[in-house]
Swiss-Prot record:
It comes from the Eukaryota. HAMAP family: Sey1. GTP binds at residues 65-72. This is Protein SEY1.
Length: 790
């Protein structure tokens, strides 16, 4: 929007005490009027009045001070602006609101000097004016706006006001500093935020009796003390006054009594600004282009305007606040008595709909009682205190709300946990989502019944419930994931056992290749997202855990199936297969020692050829099986198995070594003993067979005893006995009991011979010798009896 010359002239008077060329003067624009409305045409004004593109090349200076202290005059004389000044014949408010003007030149000791930067000057309505009286709201907001948007804030003060509290506007500055700290102070916590504001204290009507240094010391001390008494937010307690502000002083003589010295003081201040350039510093600049500054200024005013800390109540409002507070207290106490009556004990089986209606009735009755007594007071205060009472009642009823909400959540959560466990991994993610959604909806619907039409928020409870649900789901997900891992490891272990047992039937050089291939097939199949809704990280960890456990199972299963006892049994079985049976699987009968020794050597070699294959897990290419993980690492075992091994076992474990060398030696020794024993036993049977009666003897006996043989056949009794005896011998032979029967018969015969010899000796020896021996036996027996009695 382009501003016309007429619009600018309407808002700024051309009257001024400044004797400068009127062609250089720039009319001011009112950026905030006395009704607190912000003018959005500032940027158009700046673009119209500045000679070139402003960009970042600008400075903002504002003035603050009491009414009728010559603030506008100071700005006009120093910056050659055209702000309205007071008519000396009629002391009254001149500047209303906040005005902004462009400074074409700055007054210096060398004349009017053009600044290298564009200088924009703000004239702020004076404080303590009779026009506004006790209403200090605009004064505070205007001062805070100037402080927030300016690089240099000129505080215009008479010498006689230095050291005063109200006279020096310390009370107003304290309020402004506190609100500025609460609104904009947190930005100071950001890194590399060195922004400050220069407080330029211009001491007016300085007569020179008190040195400027002494006045500066007094004023600075007052500022420091005031800063120390501010109510600061906790996170800003450590910040100092110097972190936000720099302070500089400049004294001016009396304008009327010492006009020449006054002008010289103005020019010296101009030198400090644009000639010596000692007052403009980079950290004072807002570091935004001019169009950004105008937007920032508008946002600052919006925030300041809506801030309640700058408002002060009137007497009428104070009365309304006191009476309404009194009414609120009385009504609330009456509400508490009803509250104690209804909620003295917590009902376990509560009807949430009825409880919600009771909440509404109790609150409505209390608010109606308040309305009857407080509605005649100031409307704003009445509504504010009504909202306060409503909040107190809501907070008290929320205590009951929270108790029942917790019981409800606990009950439903317990049911949810049972339903979750019952899923047992079937479409887990889908069903879990349905269950959790149903649970939350049920809780929200139930709590809404007693939420006082939404005044009692259930967000905190539902948020906590959601966290509980998530924690429960996460816990069950871990259980289900571990179950999947363990089941998969168990399945792999079973397949691995079958594969190894199959290979043990006929071990060869490719035995471990076949076992490893089967292992890899099951090993590589495990993966995916498992359908549990777990995160990628959890899935990856589960896969890692499965792989580690799988290699542990590989190690354990191989050592379980190929222990030294089972290895010894396997060697013996293989030896027996070659030593005791022929190629057709029939038992072998050795007739000579040469055949025995040859078969023994072959069988022994056949048995021992699998020993190096089974004791070391080695592939056909000669390489040992090496797992992807070091399953003996204690940290990995603790991570994946949850088992911490703090033993001091310093033995080097070898994954491929199924049977250790020591165990291998033990197996070989036992195997040698066993097969040697079988060899000796078999050889003894051959020798016995060789030392038996020759077969031709039986032929001779048959020829010589032919008559007796025929006599037996012709005799029915002898023939029957022969058949029975032959059948008995055949049965014993068939049952492989012939040798034991012969042994029993031989021992029986030996006993019979011994008894016969004894009887024969008794007959042949004299009776007196027999009698003597019997007496000796009796005497010996008696002695034995006596010894036993002793």
């Amino acid at each position: 929007m382009e501003l016309s010359e007429g619009e600018l002239s309407h808002t700024s008077s051309s009257s001024s005490f400044v004797p400068v060329d009127q062609r250089q003067l720039q009319d001011a624009i009112q950026i905030i009027d006395e009704d607190k409305h912000f003018n959005t045409g500032i940027l158009d004004y700046i673009n119209k009045t500045s000679p070139a593109d402003v960009g970042n090349n600008y400075h903002i200076i504002s003035v603050f001070g009491s009414q009728s202290t010559g603030k506008s005059t100071l700005l006009n004389r120093l910056f050659n602006t055209n702000f309205d000044v007071m008519d000396e014949s009629n002391r009254q408010q001149t500047t209303k609101g906040i005005w902004l003007a462009y400074s074409p030149v700055v007054s210096t000791t060398s004349g009017h000097t053009t600044s290298k930067s564009n200088i924009l000057v703000m004239d702020v309505e004076g404080t303590d004016g009779r026009e506004r009286g006790e209403d200090q709201d605009f004064e505070r907001k205007a001062a805070l706006f100037a402080l927030s948007t300016s690089e240099i804030l000129i505080i215009n003060i008479w010498e006689t006001q230095v050291g005063l509290y109200q006279g020096a506007n310390m009370g107003l500055l304290k309020t402004v500093f506190e609100v500025n700290l609460s609104l904009f102070g947190k930005s100071k916590l950001e890194k590399h935020n060195e922004h400050k504001v220069l407080l330029l204290i211009v001491i007016r009507d300085h007569v020179g009796v008190t040195p400027v240094e002494s006045l500066a010391k007094t004023f600075t001390s007052d500022l420091q003390n005031m800063w120390g008494s501010l109510s600061k937010p906790a996170e800003l307690e450590h910040l100092r006054f110097a972190d936000f502000f720099d302070v500089s002083f400049h004294a001016l003589n009396h304008k009327v009594l010492q006009p020449k010295e006054f002008g010289e003081g103005i020019n010296k201040l101009g030198d400090r600004l644009v000639v010596n350039n000692e007052l403009f510093k980079p950290e004072y600049h807002h570091d935004v282009p001019i169009d950004g500054w105008t937007m920032y200024a508008e946002r600052c005013w919006e925030q300041i305007e809506t801030n309640k800390d700058l408002d002060l109540p009137t007497q009428q409002i104070l009365v309304a606040q006191f009476k309404c507070d009194e009414i609120v207290e009385g009504v609330f106490q009456e509400f508490l008595s009803k509250y104690q009556h209804h909620f003295k004990e917590v009902d376990v089986d509560v009807d949430f709909a009825e409880l919600g209606e009771l909440f509404v009735d109790l609150r409505s009755d209390s608010l109606e009682d308040y309305d009857v007594s407080a509605s005649r007071y100031n409307k704003a205060v009445y509504e504010q205190k009504r909202a306060k009472l409503r909040g107190l009642i809501n907070d008290k009823l929320k205590e009951v709300f929270d108790v029942h909400a917790k019981k409800l959540c606990d009950t439903l959560l317990e049911t949810f946990q049972k339903d979750l466990v019952a899923l047992k991994g079937k479409d887990f993610a889908v069903n879990v989502k349905a269950l959790s959604t149903k649970l939350v909806e049920q809780v929200v619907d139930t709590l809404s019944l007693m939420s006082l039409h939404g005044d009692i928020s259930s967000n905190e409870i539902t948020s906590g419930l959601s966290k509980e649900i998530d924690a429960t789901i996460a816990k069950q997900q871990v259980i289900e994931l571990n179950s999947i891992v363990n089941k998969s490891v168990k399945k792999l272990s079973g397949s691995l056992s079958k594969s190894i047992q199959f290979e043990l039937g006929d071990p060869n050089d490719e035995t471990w290749d076949n076992v490893l291939q089967m292992f890899k097939e099951s090993y590589d199949k495990f993966g995916g997202d498992f359908g549990l809704g777990t995160s990628t990280t959890q899935n990856e960890q589960a896969i890692e855990r499965f792989k580690f456990k799988s290699w542990c199972q590989f190690y354990d299963v191989t050592r379980k199936l190929i222990s030294k006892e089972k290895l010894l049994a396997l060697l013996q079985d293989r030896f027996d297969d070659k030593f005791r049976y022929d190629e057709n699987g029939l038992p072998k009968l050795y007739l000579n020692e040469q055949d025995l020794e040859k078969t023994f050597a072959v069988a022994k070699q056949y048995a021992l050829q699998v020993l190096p294959i089974l004791t070391l897990a080695k592939l056909a290419d000669g390489s040992e099986i090496v797992p992807e993980y070091d399953i003996f690492d204690s940290k990995l075992r603790e991570e994946f198995l949850g088992a911490y091994d703090d033993s001091d076992d310093e033995d080097d474990h070898c994954f491929a070594e199924v049977v250790t060398e020591q165990e291998k030696s033990e197996v070989l020794a036992k195997f040698k003993k066993e097969v040697d024993a079988k060899y000796i036993e078999t050889k003894r049977s051959i020798v016995q067979h060789i030392t038996q009666i020759p077969y031709y003897i039986y032929l001779i006996i048959l020829v010589l005893g032919w008559n007796e043989f025929m006599a037996i056949i012709r005799n029915p009794l002898f023939f029957s006995l022969s058949i029975v005896l032959g059948a008995t011998v055949y049965v014993l032979y068939y049952l492989n009991l012939l040798k034991p029967a012969m042994l029993v018969a031989q021992r029986t015969m030996d006993e019979v011979i011994i008894m016969a010899k004894t009887k024969l000796r008794e007959v042949l020896i004299d009776d007196h010798e027999v009698t003597g021996r019997q007496l000796n036996k009796i005497a010996g027996g008696k002695e034995n009896i006596e010894l036993d009695d002793m």
